[in-house]
């Protein structure tokens, strides 16, 4: 699908369709008022007859409106004008895309980007419209033999901006939006892929392909089990012992900052391509969704793709910690004591608390990069789902400025996170009689004790942890990966690169 921006009055648009907003109760947006005036009150007359109230989600498609060059006008209900916020704006865009796609409008000029969204500028509205449009049109049908497609799918969308001065920011918004949307799609595709296809080797192949595509400043190294043994990554290795698929850690290095002393930002993604729970096996119901336990790695991959596509002036390293947790004769057991790469020992009380065992060795491994910051992304705890539900990602950090940056980026991107405390009192729950720590700390504050466990391996750098157990995928009828938190991390890196959308 093609996107562009232009600046022009609605009556001069010659297109298959013009899209404008209507507020409650039957109140035309400024652009709709212009069209109504040119059409001698045609639109307002329809509203007076009760054709459209302007409630959110309502639509009315008009054909051959008098004195209008475009074939059709699509009126979209936007709710009450004063209540139009970021979330509702994106819902309006989503409804617009679905309606255009369903009605065979192959191209359209959209004036919804001129609606007032409190605290958000033209760049934000155009970029969010692009991201929302791509999200709305996403489908995962690679493995289906019969693929359903619209007879006349939407192919071109033009976003109108109020003045020519805003064309540059609009074009940049499209560029950024497309790169982020492509990263989200890549993450969703990886997450939705079945575990008999998407194993650690598959993740490694995708990482290598990324380096091939962006060979100018991306290199990928894949570390296998033999090298992990030499490095002392015994906790990581233990988790994969029960699987016939080799554990592989893919390290994607992007260099965009020419300064020799520029330190990298490191992103670490938990990549459990299937988590049966191991010896502490999970219930059968819903176990199919444990293919999504690699969504952290999928998100990191998507972000690295965005960074490479936009050629951001940063150094960024993405680590995909690929592994599979299965029961078997070689599987690790409750009661085992593991010596991690850091030298600290861990008593295994539950083999289904495996993500932190993989991550702790990776968090030690990345010390060698002398990072400016490290952010790990993991579907880590069901406790985070209980705490924050399926709408907000859990955030923990040992560095207040980094946490504030991530929260700000999450708000701007519409990919929200909420900070949970890493209070010392929770560390006591990880005490073990037989090792330096246990791998679980009981039910109370389970998301926080998992973060406390990881914090013991991150003392040499600024670190943040994103628990995406509740936000990485949806269940039920809309089942599928969400691609979160690609948007959050993309905004964080755009901010670091100086593109904060305040132009």
Swiss-Prot record:
It comes from the Bacteria. GO terms for molecular function: manganese ion binding; metalloaminopeptidase activity. The active site is at residues 282, 356. It is found in: Cytoplasm. Its main location: cytoplasm. Its EC number is 3.4.11.1, 3.4.11.10. GO terms for cellular component: cytoplasm. Mn(2+) 2 binds at residues 270, 275, 293, 354. It holds the Pfam family Peptidase_M17_N. Keywords: Aminopeptidase, Cytoplasm, Hydrolase, Manganese, Metal-binding, Protease. Binds 2 manganese ions per subunit. It catalyses: Release of an N-terminal amino acid, Xaa-|-Yaa-, in which Xaa is preferably Leu, but may be other amino acids including Pro although not Arg or Lys, and Yaa may be Pro. Amino acid amides and methyl esters are also readily hydrolyzed, but rates on arylamides are exceedingly low; Release of an N-terminal amino acid, preferentially leucine, but not glutamic or aspartic acids. The keyword Protease applies. The keyword Magnesium does not apply. Mn(2+) 1 binds at residues 275, 352, 354. Its cofactor is Mn(2+). CDD domains: Peptidase_M17 (cd00433). GO terms for biological process: proteolysis. InterPro entries: Leucine_aapep/pepB, Macro_dom-like, Peptidase_M17_C, Peptidase_M17_leu_NH2_pept, Peptidase_M17_N. Presumably involved in the processing and regular turnover of intracellular proteins. Catalyzes the removal of unsubstituted N-terminal amino acids from various peptides. Belongs to the peptidase M17 family. This is Probable cytosol aminopeptidase. The gene is pepA.
């Amino acid at each position: 699908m093609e996107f562009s921006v232009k600046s022009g009055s609605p009556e001069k648009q010659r297109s298959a369709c013009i899209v404008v907003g209507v507020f409650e109760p039957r109140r035309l947006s400024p652009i709709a008022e212009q069209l109504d005036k040119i059409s001698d009150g045609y639109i307002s007359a329809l509203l007076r007859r009760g054709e459209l109230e302007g409630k959110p989600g309502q639509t009315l498609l008009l054909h051959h409106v008098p004195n209008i060059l475009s074939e059709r006008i699509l009126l979209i209900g936007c709710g009450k004008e004063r209540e139009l916020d970021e979330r509702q704006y994106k819902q309006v865009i989503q409804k617009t895309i679905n309606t255009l796609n369903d009605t065979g409008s192959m191209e359209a000029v959209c004036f919804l980007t001129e609606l007032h969204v409190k605290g958000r500028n033209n760049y934000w509205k155009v970029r969010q419209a692009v991201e929302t449009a791509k999200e709305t049109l996403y489908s995962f049908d690679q493995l289906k033999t019969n693929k359903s497609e619209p007879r006349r799918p939407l192919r071109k969308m033009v976003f109108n901006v109020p003045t020519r001065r805003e064309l540059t920011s609009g074009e940049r918004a499209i560029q950024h939006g497309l790169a982020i949307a492509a990263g989200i799609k890549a993450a969703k595709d990886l997450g939705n892929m079945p575990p008999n296809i998407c194993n650690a080797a598959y993740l490694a192949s995708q990482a290598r392909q990324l380096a091939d595509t962006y060979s100018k400043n991306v290199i990928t190294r894949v570390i296998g089990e033999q090298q992990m043994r030499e490095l002392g990554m015994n906790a990581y290795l233990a988790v994969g012992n029960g699987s016939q698929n080799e554990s592989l850690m893919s390290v994607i290095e992007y260099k965009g900052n020419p300064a020799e002393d520029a330190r990298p930002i490191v992103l670490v993604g938990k990549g459990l391509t299937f988590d049966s729970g191991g010896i502490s096996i999970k219930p059968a119901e819903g176990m199919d969704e444990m293919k999504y336990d690699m969504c952290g790695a999928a998100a990191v991959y998507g972000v690295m793709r965005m960074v490479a596509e936009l050629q951001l002036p940063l150094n960024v390293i993405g680590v995909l910690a690929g592994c599979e947790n299965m029961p078997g004769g070689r599987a690790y057991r409750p009661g085992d004591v593991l010596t991690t790469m850091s030298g600290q020992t861990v008593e295994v009380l539950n083999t289904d608390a495996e993500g932190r065992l993989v991550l702790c060795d990776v968090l030690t491994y990345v010390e060698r990069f002398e990072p400016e910051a490290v952010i790990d992304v993991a579907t880590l705890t069901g406790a985070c789902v209980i705490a924050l539900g399926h709408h907000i990602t859990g955030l923990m950090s040992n560095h207040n400025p980094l946490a504030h940056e991530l929260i700000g980026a999450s708000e701007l991107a519409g990919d929200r996170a909420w900070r949970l405390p890493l209070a010392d009192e929770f560390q006591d729950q990880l005490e073990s009689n037989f090792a330096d720590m246990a791998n679980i700390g009981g039910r109370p504050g389970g998301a926080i004790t998992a973060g406390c466990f990881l914090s013991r391996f991150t003392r040499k750098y600024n670190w943040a942890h994103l628990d995406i157990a509740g936000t990485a995928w949806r269940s039920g009828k809309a089942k599928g990966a969400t691609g979160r938190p690609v948007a959050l991390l993309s905004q964080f890196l755009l901010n670091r690169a100086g593109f904060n959308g305040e132009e």
